[in-house]
């Protein structure tokens, strides 16, 4: 699908824009599933000031969506109308240390934040080592693993409103819940401050190595996948419910339920976004019939089907 080109009009409104603004840019290469249609406009800001300028001059009727590295995302096949914003590491990926505090931009990889904390002998962020996303996504969904979550270590988050106004949220204001936060979807996170505790670096590194070894053993990390597909229901594991329903290895087109971990869907090579989403809905339907549990998507699905 090709959208009407809105880029010339937007550029005329924003003569001082420094970031890159492209029309009808494919989003498939920007997602781990490697599927999906184009963005009507794709904006890569130079830095936070540039993003604030862009948002303050963007007509309110134009929808906005922000993506990270695309590790927890299905972009539907017909793409997204409006503007998709992708925060680059340059300008949004800096990580700094201040005592037992870690400051990270929204485009910083979770794994790099864990590594920076470990190098500074700061414990508490080891769980990020096994999460294949960015800090912006971690803030949005209260990312967690191995019994720890973002809300356990967050002090405050920085953000911009849809109109480009700067905002700050403390831990309480984030209204975290399991794999979610209470912040309006129109808000774009730009960075965060975390606090850990000083500990022996060897012990921190050992825990991170355990996280990585476990992940390589039980997750299909070398496949085209979006990570955990469904949230774990209270007191239960999604993968066990999926396995019990007989869906391990089940396929729709080029999409497959991973044989290695049932809560991972994979693109075997030629899948469409429709294949993957249809497979996910088939899993939900089968689990509902088998166990009565209504699995909820953890992976974000956006765009026109």
From Swiss-Prot:
Coiled-coil stretches are: none
Tell me the keywords, alphabetical order. Cell cycle, Cell division, Cell shape, Cell wall biogenesis/degradation, Cytoplasm, FAD, Flavoprotein, NADP, Oxidoreductase, Peptidoglycan synthesis
GO annotation, biological process: cell division; cell wall organization; peptidoglycan biosynthetic process; regulation of cell shape
Give compartment(s): Cytoplasm
What's its catalytic activity? UDP-N-acetyl-alpha-D-muramate + NADP(+) = UDP-N-acetyl-3-O-(1-carboxyvinyl)-alpha-D-glucosamine + NADPH + H(+)
Q: What InterPro entries is this protein classified in?
A: FAD-bd_PCMH, FAD-bd_PCMH-like_sf, FAD-bd_PCMH_sub1, FAD-bd_PCMH_sub2, MurB, MurB_C, MurB_C_sf, Oxid_FAD_bind_N
For this protein, the Enzyme Commission number is 1.3.1.98
Q: Which GO terms describe its cellular component?
A: cytosol
Task: Identify the Pfam families for this entry.
Answer: FAD_binding_4, MurB_C
Q: GO: which molecular function terms?
A: FAD binding; UDP-N-acetylmuramate dehydrogenase activity
Pathway(s) annotated for this protein in UniProt:
Cell wall biogenesis; peptidoglycan biosynthesis
Highest taxon of the source?
A: Bacteria
Query: What is the active site of this protein?
Result: 179, 228, 298
Q: Record keywords: Cytoplasm included?
A: yes
List, for all copies, the residue spans of the domain called FAD-binding PCMH-type: 35-214
Q: What is its main location?
A: cytoplasm
Cofactor(s) of this protein: FAD
HAMAP family in UniProt: MurB
Family listed: Belongs to the MurB family.
Protein purpose: Cell wall formation.
User: What is the name of the protein in this document?
Assistant: UDP-N-acetylenolpyruvoylglucosamine reductase
Q: Which organism was this protein described from?
A: Nitrobacter winogradskyi (strain ATCC 25391 / DSM 10237 / CIP 104748 / NCIMB 11846 / Nb-255)
The gene that this protein is the product of is murB
């Amino acid at each position: 699908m090709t959208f009407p080109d809105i880029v010339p009009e937007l550029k005329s409104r924003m003569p001082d824009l420094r970031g890159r603004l492209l029309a009808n840019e494919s989003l498939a290469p920007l997602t781990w599933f490697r599927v999906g249609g184009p963005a009507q406009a794709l904006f890569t800001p130079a830095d936070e000031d540039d993003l604030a300028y862009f948002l303050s001059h963007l007509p309110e009727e134009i929808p906005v969506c922000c993506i990270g590295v695309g590790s927890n995302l299905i972009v539907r096949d017909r793409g997204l109308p409006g503007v998709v914003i992708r925060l680059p590491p340059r300008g949004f990926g800096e990580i700094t240390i201040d005592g037992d505090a870690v400051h990270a931009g929204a485009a910083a990889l979770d794994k790099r934040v864990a590594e920076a904390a470990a190098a500074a002998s700061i414990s508490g962020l080891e769980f990020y080592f096994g999460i294949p996303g960015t800090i912006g996504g971690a803030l949005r969904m209260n990312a967690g693993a191995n019994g720890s979550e973002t809300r356990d270590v967050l002090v405050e988050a920085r953000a911009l409103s849809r109109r480009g106004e700067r905002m700050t949220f403390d831990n309480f204001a984030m209204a975290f819940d399991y794999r979610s936060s209470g912040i309006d979807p129109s808000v774009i996170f730009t960075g965060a401050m975390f606090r850990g505790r000083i500990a022996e670096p060897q012990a921190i590194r050992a825990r991170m190595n355990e996280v990585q070894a476990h992940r390589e053993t039980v997750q299909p990390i070398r496949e085209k996948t979006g990570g955990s597909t469904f949230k774990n229901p209270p007191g239960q594991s999604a993968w066990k419910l999926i396995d019990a329903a007989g869906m391990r290895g089940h396929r729709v087109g080029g999409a497959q339920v991973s044989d290695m971990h049932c809560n991972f869907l994979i693109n075997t090579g030629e899948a469409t976004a429709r294949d993957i989403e249809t497979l996910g809905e088939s899993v939900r339907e089968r689990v509902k019939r088998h166990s009565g549990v209504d699995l909820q998507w953890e992976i974000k699905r956006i765009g026109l089907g």
